[in-house]
């Protein structure tokens, strides 16, 4: 009831002092995470992290809506960036904590499909993530500094994902997670 009360208060504060779109998105994000992801998905499917990634991708949209009052293409690209980042990030953690997830009955990818398949998926999603980060400059929604930063940081991330894929093990997966 405490969480529900805070959620409702945050909605009314956001609606009253910011704008209705940001408030509704915030409420949708809370519902998505608490009900859809935590209660319904987390222990129901190996795709929990992929589908649940939407919950973590909503806050940038809330911020965008709060600042602009609408959702433009850039907001949706930010959503896509966080959405695509979530699986490789948490699958790397799931490799390291595989026994804990198995004991808790959470069907994370390494528990259900093994480390090798998970490592392959980490690499695939990381390639897709780096591609999505380039959409902002492609659509002239970000400048040269962002483009160069995305390429350099994306290169580091791809290297980390490649090492997870080729080398494997907890130490390499932990580096990818961090």
Q: Which role does the model predict for each range below?
A:
Residues 1-10, 86-135, 140:
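Solvent-exposed interhelical
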Residues 2-45, 124-177:
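Transmembrane helix-loop-helix
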Residues 3-8, 51-67, 116-117, 177-178:
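Small-residue-rich segments of transmembrane alpha-helices in multi-pass membrane proteins
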Residues 28, 51, 76, 80, ...:
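Internal alpha-helical transmembrane segments of multi-pass membrane proteins, especially GPCRs
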Residues 37, 63, 92-93:
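Alpha-helical transmembrane segments and their lipid-water interface positions
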Residues 41-52, 69-75, 95-106, 165-174:
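A cytosolic-side transmembrane-helix exit/cap motif
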Residues 61-74, 129-137, 178:
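Hydrophobic alpha-helical transmembrane segments in multi-pass integral membrane proteins
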Residues 70-88:
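Alpha-helical transmembrane segments
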């Amino acid at each position: 009831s405490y969480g529900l009360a805070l959620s409702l208060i945050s909605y009314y504060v956001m609606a009253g002092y910011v704008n209705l779109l940001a408030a509704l998105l915030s409420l949708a994000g809370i519902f998505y995470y608490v009900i859809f992801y935590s209660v319904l998905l987390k222990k129901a499917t190996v795709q929990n992290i992929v589908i649940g990634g939407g919950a973590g991708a909503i806050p940038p949209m809330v911020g965008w809506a709060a600042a602009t009052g609408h959702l433009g293409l850039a907001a949706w690209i930010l959503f896509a960036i966080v959405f695509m980042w979530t699986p490789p990030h948490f699958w790397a953690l799931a490799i390291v904590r595989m026994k804990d997830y198995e004991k808790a009955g959470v069907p994370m990818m390494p528990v259900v499909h093994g480390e090798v398949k998970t490592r392959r998926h980490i690499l695939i999603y990381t390639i897709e993530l780096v591609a999505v980060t380039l959409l902002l400059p492609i659509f002239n929604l970000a400048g040269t500094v962002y483009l160069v930063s995305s390429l350099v940081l994306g290169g580091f991330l791809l290297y980390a994902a490649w090492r997870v894929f080729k080398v494997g093990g907890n130490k390499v997966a932990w580096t990818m997670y961090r």
